């Protein structure tokens, strides 16, 4: 149980480096990445909403992936940028818990949206004649609501485990945001239940969502090979290839981060990996899923042409 004598009211985030010249360089780099991520994902959401021919299940799910990536990056990057410039690198205890909650919730929302997108591709490629009726607006709304609700509840459960820990001593977190592994290393109460819960929840959700994706593709690949037209096969492989690329990158980093017990070495390595999936992946998803998509590019060109014409 959480002790009443908890003394820590704020934590110090050590960030990525203490070298001033590197901090300025990294600030510039991550600010540029964040601006591209925000502008790109917001633009993608608006583009899909504004163009009627993009009102299909695939783009509906893509718009939600863009929204989650935007939230994912915004939960971490602004504080990281502040740490690069500020002498006081602190975060309050409540703010730390909120950041932990949002991170855990958004990770689970994203992995299940990726699973839903795999199922959507299965329906489109393996059952094209029934796709329109079975992937109705109500079905799509249900499929996208489940990840949000489940992610919110899972994040709350895991954050409550952290809240029940007592932090009475050191308050320096060896990270650039409030991540569970380095945070629980600072607890002065028993962390066994929290570590066990973290391992089980991460292991189960990563494995189960990946299982859904793998099963979907076990049906998708044979169906693609049966497509007679070369253009049809190339289009199907291109769509699935983009999805598999994003899945591989995202899941590999998460498995590396969470399926190991916290230690000094794992925290240091995890910090480097976390840079990639909290700042770079939200930008990469935009490129992988959107800018390689013919319909999205055509819609973007049309919107830009109209703005130039009316300006």
Curated annotation (Swiss-Prot):
UniProt-annotated glycosylation sites, renumbered to this chain: 4
Keyword hit for Chaperone: no
Subcellular location(s) per record: Cell membrane
Main location: membrane
Lineage summary: Eukaryota, Metazoa, Chordata, Craniata, Vertebrata
Residues that span the membrane, as ranges: 25-45, 54-74, 99-119, 139-159, 196-216, 237-257, 271-291
Cytoplasmic-facing ranges: 46-53, 120-138, 217-236, 292-311
InterPro entries: GPCR_Rhodpsn (IPR000276), GPCR_Rhodpsn_7TM (IPR017452), Olfact_rcpt (IPR000725)
Extracellular side: 1-24, 75-98, 160-195, 258-270
GO cellular component: plasma membrane
Protein name: Olfactory receptor 5M8
Keywords: Cell membrane, Disulfide bond, G-protein coupled receptor, Glycoprotein, Membrane, Olfaction, Receptor, Sensory transduction, Transducer, Transmembrane, Transmembrane helix
GO BP terms, alphabetized: G protein-coupled receptor signaling pathway; sensory perception of smell
GO MF annotations in UniProt: G protein-coupled receptor activity; odorant binding; olfactory receptor activity
Disulphides: 96-188
Functional note: Odorant receptor.
Membrane-topology annotation of the record: Multi-pass membrane protein
Family under the similarity heading: Belongs to the G-protein coupled receptor 1 family.
UniProt keyword Cell membrane, yes or no: yes
